[in-house]
Structure formats: C-alpha cells, structure tokens
C-alpha cells in the first residue's frame, strides 16, 4: 500500500492553521454532543451494546470479531430488542 504520510494537507492537526484547529475542535465537541443526545434518546442502542457485552462475557469466545458478526447478524436480534423495549416500558 502506498505511503500517504504528509501527502494530503489536513490529515494531521499540525498542518492546520490556528483558525482551522479551532473549527476542528468545535466540530469535534459538537459531534460528541450530538452523538450523546442520540444515544440517550435511542434505548435500543444501549440494549444492543449491553446485550452484546453480556453474551461475550458469559460465553468468552476465542474469536471476538466472528462472535460479534454472528451476534449482530442474528435474524432474531431485532425481535429480542423489540421485546426488551416492550418489557422495559411495562416496568416503567
């Protein structure tokens, strides 16, 4: 693969002007805020991630990438998440 180090301006923060660095910093902060708001309003994401980690820690697979691929492509997963959402709404 070709070495792209330093060939495209902007890949490295040290090549940015102070104004560009400030804009980049603001963009990163805004992106984090937006992501946090999304995660807080979409309970299904929390259920997906916590379910994955729970299963991974219980089963302790040797090949984690393969386990993750199998977990997230399980055709039953959407229904499991839907049922958990319903269960949590009833409990609230």
Swiss-Prot record:
CDD domains: DD_RIIAD1 (cd22971). Residues 43-77 form the RIIa domain. This is RIIa domain-containing protein 1.
